[in-house]
């Protein structure tokens, strides 16, 4: 399955779920309801923080500007005019990862009051519920695309049952909650997990297949085979979801205290349907927004790379 088809499938599942869950009076009240929906109640700019560099996995959010806008290479903030509705607003989509010290979305929502929505995963929401509670308002992806990828010439893993016996090191980001689950269930040994991953391909390339590494099914397998010349060959992977760790990945969330504000609720009543429509529009015609995402990555000029062929 191509990268584009896989991403579209993941996004489609999320949109079907959103449609099925949006028809009751109780749900309408929680989101502000059609009667209270007011885009003019939204802040200007509308700030949304992601958890990584610009990429198509956030296509529905970048689509809010219809492909218009530019990125600040220093801050990683992409800014452009809202292309939906009749209320003039600027949209600011902030890159995550190294631009924010690899902080999770929950932490960013509490450290910067200007941020309206941030990307969070279910596992981090549960873990941080006491100290940094969040409420998800839109599931952008239904099937968690997180993976552990590996060199098929080194390891012939067919399922998670093969990983522990191999003794392979799993290079992950620090604070990846699924690693605690993998250890607790005996799928891997604690000493196999190395939480020093910084998002760069350098370590995986240098180890020449000796280690496994976290990634996204919709991103790294293509990049390593086609865009990262130091590797330049296929990788295989196991989905984290197939280990039994089933979460919503990259849901857009807000601080619960902000939901007590009637204006914020009215804003969300208008903005969430726009986010849904933008996601549909991105799947139907991703070209302009993908071009903007690709240009943003070029302008950032970092270790993270995308190609025109890859982003399609």
Provide a role label for each language-model segment.
Residues 59, 126, 161, 176-180, ...:
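Solvent-exposed, polar/charged alpha-helical surfaces in well-ordered, non-transmembrane soluble domains
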Residues 21-31:
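Bacterial lipoprotein signal-peptidase II cleavage site
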Residues 14-19:
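C-terminal motif of bacterial Sec signal peptides marking the signal peptidase cleavage site
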Residues 140-150, 229-261, 268-272:
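Periplasmic-binding protein-like
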């Amino acid at each position: 399955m191509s990268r584009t088809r896989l991403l579209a499938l993941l996004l489609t599942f999320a949109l079907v779920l959103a449609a099925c869950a949006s028809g009751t009076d109780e749900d309408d009240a929680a989101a502000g309801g059609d009667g209270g929906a007011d885009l003019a109640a939204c802040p200007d700019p509308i700030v949304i923080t992601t958890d990584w560099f610009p990429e198509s996995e956030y296509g529905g959010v970048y689509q809010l500007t219809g492909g218009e806008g530019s990125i600040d290479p220093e801050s990683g903030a992409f800014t452009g005019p809202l292309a939906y509705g009749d209320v003039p607003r600027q949209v600011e989509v902030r890159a995550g990862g190294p631009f924010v010290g690899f902080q999770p979305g929950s932490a960013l929502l509490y450290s910067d009051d200007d941020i309206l929505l941030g990307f969070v995963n279910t596992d981090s929401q549960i873990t941080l519920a006491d100290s940094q509670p969040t409420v998800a308002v839109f599931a952008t992806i239904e099937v968690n695309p997180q993976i552990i990828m590996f060199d098929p010439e080194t390891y012939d893993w067919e399922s998670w049952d093969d990983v522990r016996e191999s003794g392979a090191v799993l290079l992950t980001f620090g604070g990846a909650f699924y690693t605690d689950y993998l250890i607790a269930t005996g799928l891997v040994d604690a000493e196999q997990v190395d939480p020093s991953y910084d998002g760069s391909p350098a370590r995986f390339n240098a180890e020449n297949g000796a280690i496994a590494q976290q990634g996204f099914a919709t991103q790294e397998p293509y990049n390593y085979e086609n865009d990262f010349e130091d590797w330049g060959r296929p990788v295989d992977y196991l989905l984290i979801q197939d280990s039994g760790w089933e979460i919503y990945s990259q849901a857009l969330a807000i601080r619960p205290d902000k939901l007590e504000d009637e204006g914020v609720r009215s804003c969300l009543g208008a903005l969430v349907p726009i986010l849904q429509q933008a996601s549909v529009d991105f799947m139907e015609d991703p070209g302009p927004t993908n071009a903007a995402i690709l240009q943003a990555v070029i302008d950032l000029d970092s270790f993270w790379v995308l190609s025109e062929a890859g982003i399609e």
